[in-house]
Every structure is written in C-alpha cells, then in structure tokens.
Amino acid sequence: PHKPLDDLTADEIIEIVKEAGIVGMGGAGFPTCVKLKPAKPVDTILLNGCECEPYLTADHKVLLAYADEIIFGLKAILKTTGAEKGIIVIEDNKPDAIELMKEKVADIGNMEVFVARTKYPQGAEKTLIKRVLGRIVPSGGLPADVGVIVDNISTVKAIADAIQTGMPLIERVATVTGEKIKNPGNFIIKIGTSVKDLIDYCGGFTDDDVLVKMGGPMMGFPLNTLDVPMMKGSNGIIAIDTDETKEQPCIKCGRCVDVCPMELSPLYFVKYAKEENWQGMKDMNVMDCVECRCCQYICSSKI
C-alpha cells in the first residue's frame, strides 16, 4: 500500500498508475497515466458506467460490488487532474447501481450521478460528452479539448486498487455469456487467461455450431481460435449462433447514415475502401468513426 491519498501528490499518483500498468479497460487500452496529464485544463471527469453493448454486464457488476473503490478512484483522478467535478454516468436500465452510487455521492459536493437513457452506442466517448455536458468534441480532437476526461468504471477501480493495496492491473471482471455458453456469468479473471480455459470453466458450449467473439456482439471481433489471452481491455466473451448471411452490393438506401451516432456517411467508407481511395475516406472524416457498427447492424445488404 502507498501513502494515504491526502498525502500523495499528483505526480506520485500518476507514477503509481504508470507502475501498476493501468490502461483504459473499456476496450481502448490507452495508458491511463498519459490521460491523467492532459495537455489542456479539464474541469470535468466522466466515469463511463453505461456499458451499452448488448450481453455485457461486467461494469454493472463492478458498480455494485466495488462502489467504495470507484468513489476513491474518482477522488484520486480529481486530485490528479485538478478537475472541479466528477460525474458517474449510468444507463437507466441499471436502477440498482444508480441507487447505490447516488447514496455514495450524496454527501460529496463535487460528485454526482447522471442517469442516461439506455441507447446504443451511449458509451462512446464523444457521444457521452455530448449527451451529458452538451459539448461537442471537434473532428480529430480529444475529450480534453473540451475540458473533459472520460474513464471506464473498471479503470477507476483499478486505480483505487493500485493506491490502496499496491496491486497492479493483473485481473479484471469480465462477462462470459451468449446462448451457446452452458453456465454464463461475470468472473474475476487473471490477465492472460486463455479464452479456451475461460469457456471450459463455464462448462463449455451447448453445441458445436458457435461463433465466439471477444467483446460484445456489436463491437466485438470473431475469434478464429480459442487459444488467445484475455487482455486488460477484454470486457467479455460471447458465444452465439454462426451467421452465414452473405454480403450483397450496396443499394444506397441511406439507413447507415440515419443511424450513425457521429453523423457520418458509412456507405462511402465502403465504396472508397474497395477503391483503396484512402484520401477520400479521410475527407469523409473516417477518423471520427467510433466503430460502433450500427451501420453494419442496420445494413439491408449485410455489408
């Protein structure tokens, strides 16, 4: 364990986070020690507890099981960054977590709970900032450009562990679920545990016709082998039916444009990618894409 939080300087906290190997645990894996030293002043810390990806409930479980650690971790971030306020954002389909966290922050003047409407992809950084604070992160910009830092709930819990117990980031809570898993649930797993061992621990598959994804059904990616490790940003494994649907040519219906949370035009990304027109993709602001795959989900051509 390190010194009490009140006795630690901002630089000491950042060094603790760095030595503990803490990264963004919502999937991005960006080093948290870098995020705690923003190039521009920030006034607000958003704790992302939305977990809008279907099937996954790991962050929900962390909110319920480690509420005190989350509050401690948020205090550490506020002290380190000099931000004035911390907001814990939770979707309205988690009433038990909302009630618990509201109790925890009731007597803390610079913390509050924001209840967001359950909507995918609410948890995307830029979407979250716009929804909660009404601020728009510029194209190609970072949350710090509008005075905000966004951290995942599990990341903040890891910060608390590092300061309070000295434990580096060697384990995390992850969801193993899907209709093909015999005994689904949320588990504390060691970083580096193979997907195969994790699925075996859950009793294996219900049958052999299965598609395994690292992450959720929307933003997760299919695995060709189960001999891969769970990483710091691995929030879940799902096992679902295989999808044999074949891709058809784009009919330019525009449904992908309608559902894009970043107000982009995904149909042109497909066109330009096939043409290897990378400048065209850049001109269409492809770097603002948050890879939520709403366009893929809604696409009538199954692109």
Locations of the language-model features?
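Acidic low-complexity segments
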Residues: 1-25, 30, 39-40, 95
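Gly-rich Lys/Arg/Thr-decorated short loops/hinges at beta-loop-alpha junctions or inter-strand turns
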Residues: 45-59, 180
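Short glycine/threonine-rich loop-to-helix capping motif typified by GTGT followed
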Residues: 94-102, 222-229, 300
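Active-site gating/interface segments in enzymes
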Residues: 119-123, 127-136, 204-251
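Ferredoxin-type iron-sulfur electron-transfer modules in oxidoreductases and energy-metabolism complexes
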Residues: 234-247, 255-257, 261-303
